[in-house]
Amino acid sequence: MPAKQRTPKVNRNPDLIRGVGKYSRSQMYHKRGLWAIKAKNGGVFPRHDAKSKVDAPVEKPPKFYPAEDVKKPLPNRRTAKPTKLRASITPGTVLIILAGRFKGKRVVFLKQLASGLLLVTGPFKINGVPLRRVNQAYVIGTSTKVDISGVTLDKFDDKYFGKVAEKKKKKTEGEFFEAEKEEKKEIPQVKKDDQKAVDAALIKAIEAVPELKTYLGARFSLKQGMKPHELVF
């Protein structure tokens, strides 16, 4: 590609000799159209005021940055979005737990908490599953349902299941070398009473349906030859 040729600037008032132009000052005044600019602004050339100078800072900024620069915290723009509940899971649906301590147990779904976890119970009196939170990824929804209209669930939220932080006691020299005995944590009486109240309302609805109590008490398991993808729950 050939290089672009530079076009030399043409002076509108070429010099006849050094310091003497071809056109006079008045001729260049008309040639450059300055008369039109003056007439447009009421017989006066437009003036552009100089920009105001910024006041000098009282203290000079440091010449060098510190070696350990403090990181600026980034703004948190995350918004809490509610977890979508599966269409097969509705209040009162009997679920099968697939993992954890109560794997294979059938439980009754009560409601979805703000964190997205499911509030379920056995009931405890039937199969030993207390009021607990379960992720919906680890349950199978069945077609069996229990009427939970008589169960009061207003007080149950994520804070209800939170653990109370305990202060660690400082050990003496003798206690440090002794084998630490694990103390059995006792369940608060309030939670025991809440479990009994929920169980009483659920068992009343369960006993109204024949063989539902036996169904909830039985543990789910796959036998040889059973294909889980072909089962209808």
From Swiss-Prot:
Disordered: annotated span: 48-80
GO biological process: translation
Entry's Gene Ontology molecular function annotations: mRNA binding; structural constituent of ribosome
One Gene Ontology cellular component annotation held by this UniProt entry: mitochondrion
Composition bias type Basic and acidic residues, residue spans: 48-72
Pfam families for this protein: Ribosomal_L6e (PF01159), Ribosomal_L6e_N (PF03868)
InterPro entries tied to this protein: 60S_ribosomal_eL6 (IPR000915), Rib_uL2_dom2 (IPR014722), Ribosomal_eL6_KOW (IPR041997), Ribosomal_uL6_N (IPR005568), Translation_prot_SH3-like_sf (IPR008991)
Domain of life: Eukaryota
Record keywords: Ribonucleoprotein, Ribosomal protein
Family as reported in the entry's similarity comment: Belongs to the eukaryotic ribosomal protein eL6 family.
Protein name: Large ribosomal subunit protein eL6x
Biological source species: Arabidopsis thaliana
Record gene name: RPL6C
